[in-house]
Design a protein with these regions (language model features):
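Extracytoplasmic small-molecule ligand-binding "clamshell" domains
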Residues: 22-23, 36-119, 123, 127, ...
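Extended ligand-binding regions for polar small-molecule ligands
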Residues: 34-39, 75-87, 146-166, 170, ...
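Periplasmic-binding protein-like
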Residues: 60-61, 133-144, 206-248, 271-274, ...
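A ligand-binding cleft/hinge motif common to bilobed small-molecule-binding domains
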Residues: 117-128, 191-225, 392-393, 397-402
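Export/targeting segments at the very N-terminus of extracytoplasmic proteins
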Residues: 268-316, 350, 367-368
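Short, functionally critical alpha-helical segments immediately adjacent to catalytic or ligand/cofactor-binding
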Residues: 302-318, 353-357, 380-385, 431
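Catalytic and substrate-binding regions of cell-wall glycan-acting enzymes that process beta-1,4-linked
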Residues: 378-441
Length: 459
């Protein structure tokens, strides 16, 4: 005991506020304003169920989703998200964004529910967002222009600003001259090294493989590290995160995620010779027949690049191609098919493309209306290759075994059970590969012109 009388609690509080009120009041006001401007909202799944839609924002590309105008949308992420929305019994709405930063901003503002950024899970820019279970494992790669002799430690390396790749290069190659580019997309990074502005760029293996035909001069220098890709979800939306994780876990366990990933990745790989051959054929052979592809595609309301991809798989755009079984011409028609479609000269490119496009349209018309794009295209391609009866049989097997006869991934599994069906599965895969390559080739001109305007080198 000191002998001093203890002050009442009220007196202590009063003196405290008298001494510190000038600091406390402004702090409280700032806190109130902050909460009003940035409310810590806890979202519930009822919000988008009542709205009836899942709002997704992402960067369009060969590894995510590709809009085809009137011909629909397709791609790994589109099909995965479509299945997720179907499971929730709501519609899927997809908005394109120019870069990952725009995706992140939309999620932070609550303008979208879910985002496709293409960024590794450990990317610093994703801080504050909800991150789902991974849907894909990738490998970060150092990409060079063929013939580069500089070691990475002596070279100029381009990465996206404030990215996981920037952190990685700082750790692995601290001596390197690292150029951080603001808002850089995979296409823009690859174009930078393709034009010789830098010596190397860092990009994941799936992004490079999907774009390799557009950049025949680029090659792999070395693999750096593995990374995980996930869906990004608006901040504090724990309900949607739980639904997403449950869906990704289920599709991982039943194998559908792996089958979908395989379908969109196995056909992407071109070796160096294949890339250069394809580019040479695009420059020398395609211009000879492109007008006919466009004319017949317009007649049947289809994408001319799909028709061109079919022809490339059939003959490599060689009007005099002949197979061991006797099919010939740019569309490699059998004699019976040529007679059925009313043409007399299979080696005449105009007649061959006319008959081939009409025959493909006949297969499309046989597919039931319950089958939507892109499944409709894949089934029609299989029917074009081996006959509609086989596709019909595979759909019947799908229905009998509890799978979805309107989904290509399910139908293709049962198609494997039929004799000689393997060739049709490879055929669909290869046509998709060439189709994606032609889409990528055609789309590069749209952003190449504005490349200099969009880029700002980070300080």
């Amino acid at each position: 005991m000191t002998g001093k009388k203890a002050l009442p609690a009220v007196t202590i509080v009063k003196r405290f506020f008298q001494q510190y009120w000038r600091r406390i009041v402004p702090l409280c006001l700032l806190t109130i304003i902050s909460l009003q401007l940035h409310p810590s909202k806890q979202y519930t799944v009822d919000e988008f169920l009542e709205r009836g839609s899942l709002r997704v924002i992402g960067i369009a590309g060969p590894t995510t989703f590709l809009p085809h105008g009137e011909h629909g949308v397709r791609g790994l992420q589109y099909e995965l998200l479509r299945q997720f929305a179907n499971d929730l019994n709501i519609r899927l709405e997809i908005e394109q964004a120019p870069n990952a930063e725009a995706v992140i901003a939309a999620l932070e503002k609550g303008e979208a529910d879910l985002g496709i950024t293409g960024l590794a899970n450990n990317d610093p820019r994703l801080a504050g967002l909800e991150i789902s279970k991974p849907y894909l494992s990738t490998t970060q790669q150092l990409i060079q222009r063929s013939g580069t002799r500089l070691s990475p430690s002596e070279a100029k390396i381009a990465v996206s600003q404030n990215s996981a790749e920037a952190d990685l290069i700082e750790q692995l190659q601290p001596e390197a001259d690292v150029v951080q580019l603001r808002y850089a997309t995979p296409d823009e990074l690859l174009e930078e090294v393709n034009q010789g502005q830098v010596d190397y760029v860092v990009i994941n293996d799936s992004e490079f493989a999907a774009r390799r035909t557009a950049f025949p001069q680029l090659s792999l220098k070395k693999q750096l590290t593995t990374s995980q890709l996930s869906w990004t979800i608006r901040p504090r939306d724990k309900q949607l995160l739980r639904f997403a994780n449950r869906f990704l876990t289920q599709t991982g366990q039943d194998g559908s995620l792996q089958r979908l990933s395989n379908f969109y990745s196995q056909g992407n790989t071109f070796n160096a010779f294949g890339v250069k051959t394809f580019q040479k054929d695009i420059q020398q052979r395609l211009p000879l027949y492109q007008a006919q592809f466009k004319k017949q595609a317009n007649t049947h309301d289809m994408d001319w690049r799909l028709l061109a991809a079919i022809a490339y798989q059939e003959s490599k755009w060689d009007v005099n191609a002949v197979s061991p079984t006797g099919v010939t011409g740019i569309m490699m028609l059998t004699k019976n098919t040529a007679e059925e479609m009313g043409i007399t000269n299979r080696n005449n490119p105009q007649q061959s493309i006319l008959a081939g496009s009409a025959y493909y349209q006949r297969m499309i018309d046989k597919i039931p209306d319950t089958v939507h794009e892109p499944d409709r295209t894949w089934m029609a391609l299989a029917a074009y290759n081996m006959g509609y009866r086989h596709v019909l049989k595979a759909r019947e097997l799908s229905l009998k075994q509890g799978d979805d006869p309107d989904k290509w991934l399910d139908v293709s599994r049962h198609l494997r059970q039929l004799p000689r069906a393997g060739q049709a599965l490879v055929y669909v895969q290869e046509v998709r590969r060439y189709y994606d390559a032609l889409l990528l080739q055609d789309s590069r001109s749209h952003w190449m012109a504005s490349l200099e305007k969009k880029w700002v080198v980070a300080e």
